[in-house]
Design a protein with these regions (language model features):
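Ser/Thr/Gly/Pro-rich low-complexity, disordered linker/stalk segments of secreted
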Residues: 255-348
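Stable alpha-helical elements in mature extracytoplasmic
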Residues: 62-65, 69, 73, 97-100, ...
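Sec-dependent N-terminal signal peptides of Gram-positive bacterial secreted proteins and lipoproteins
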Residues: 7-30
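Sec-exported extracytoplasmic/periplasmic mature domains
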Residues: 71-82, 105-109, 117, 146, ...
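Active-site-adjacent substrate-binding region
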Residues: 147-186
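Solvent-exposed loop/turn segments at secondary-structure junctions
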Residues: 48-51, 90-95, 117-123, 137-141, ...
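Active-site-adjacent mobile loop/cap segments within catalytic or ligand-binding domains
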Residues: 43, 114-122, 171-281
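Active-site histidine-acidic residue metal-binding/catalytic motifs
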Residues: 31-103, 107-109, 122, 126-129, ...
Length: 348
């Protein structure tokens, strides 16, 4: 009898200790979603809003396009079982970059998807097509792998619509801001915030507002914006292996898949590092190959002319919204635009 009592006592001690440890030590983002919550919680972030119009084309403002895509994406994702979807904004008003990430924290989000559209600029050598921003390799590598693999699935679905796939974009801090391990932090605040808060976060640039072909084919009507959103949803569903309410399971996620990586180091496209990374199942390690120190992408004009030796007009991922300096200034003054390269803000 004494032996039985002692065994029960130690069993209770072990059980209490296990429960305590699970409460104290946080799980990874994906483990947290599958182990302690029923639903996959996704926060969709429509870029810009309020006085922050983003890029413009005549009377068309990026902030409006972003919100419509986000609303359609929410609608598409809610067709899947076990998914809860929220928006950081549901109208035309400004939300600070810090508040966007904090909203995801408050929602205990498993994923944050920031919705944007692009404009020609000077940090990447292309002026049309889609790209997805994600965390850099190195610091919190597991999180970076998760974001980049999700990005592959989203890009695959967008390119299936005919949009040119410009790959995954990574960018170094230009203010020498560093993570705890001493590595340069991510440049874009929405990506950096996700890293610091352990929330997988990607930013999708769907198409170029100032490119005639991109705009006409993908952004010129609500119906076309809905198609973009449904492609985003399909990519997310593939990665997380979601099932619709009527029992239809998403296609298997991409595996052994090679994707282009554009790594911006200083905002000058001539210094960009281009590589191709193969993404394997989780049991294998990702590999990078064919690295170069020059962004060799060309614009459509260059492809047509083939006679000029000048550098290509380069594209700025509109997400100047997400830069570290702009994040600070947007919080200091509500009159400061999140995207300093965009055209003058006009009322809708």
């Amino acid at each position: 009898m004494k032996t039985i009592i002692k065994t029960n006592y130690f069993s209770r001690v072990f059980l209490y200790g296990l429960i305590f440890s699970l409460c104290i030590f946080p799980l990874s983002a994906k483990a947290r979603q599958t182990s302690s919550k029923k639903d996959l919680c996704i926060v969709i972030d429509p870029g810009h809003g309020g006085i922050q119009s983003g890029t413009q084309r005549g009377t068309v403002e990026e902030k409006t396009l972003n919100l419509k895509i986000a609303q359609y994406l929410k609608e598409a994702l809610e067709k899947y079982k076990g998914v809860t979807v929220s928006l950081t904004r549901d109208g035309d008003y400004d939300v600070s970059l810090t508040d966007r990430t904090q909203y995801s924290v408050d929602k205990n989000a498993d994923l944050m998807v920031s919705i944007h559209n692009n404009a020609t600029g000077d940090c990447a050598a292309y002026d049309s097509g889609c790209t997805v921003l994600a965390a850099k390799d190195g610091y919190k590598q597991e999180l970076a792998d998760e974001e980049q693999k999700l990005a592959c699935n989203i890009l695959n679905e967008l390119s299936a619509l005919g949009i040119e796939n410009q790959g995954i974009l990574l960018r170094d801090s230009e203010a020498n801001e560093k993570y705890e391990n001493g590595e340069l932090a991510d440049y874009y605040a929405i990506i950096r915030g996700g890293v610091l808060k352990d929330i997988p976060t990607v930013l999708v640039e769907h198409a170029f507002v100032d490119d005639d072909s991109d705009f006409e084919n993908y952004l010129s009507s609500d119906a076309k914006l809905k198609v973009l959103a449904e492609a985003d949803a399909k990519g997310i569903a593939r990665y997380y292996q979601l099932t619709t309410e009527d029992g239809k399971k998403a296609e298997s996620p991409l595996e052994n898949y090679k994707e282009k990586i554009v790594h911006i180091v200083d905002g000058n496209s001539k210094h960009n590092k281009i590589s191709y990374k193969t993404y394997y199942p989780s049991s294998k390690k990702e590999t990078e190959e064919n690295s170069s120190n020059t962004d060799t992408a060309t614009t459509k004009a260059e492809k047509q002319e083939q006679t000029t030796e000048k550098s290509a007009p380069e594209a700025k991922t509109d997400v100047g919204l997400e830069s570290e300096s702009q994040e600070k200034s947007s919080e200091e003054s509500s009159n400061t635009s999140e995207n300093t390269s965009s055209k003058s803000v006009t009322k809708p």
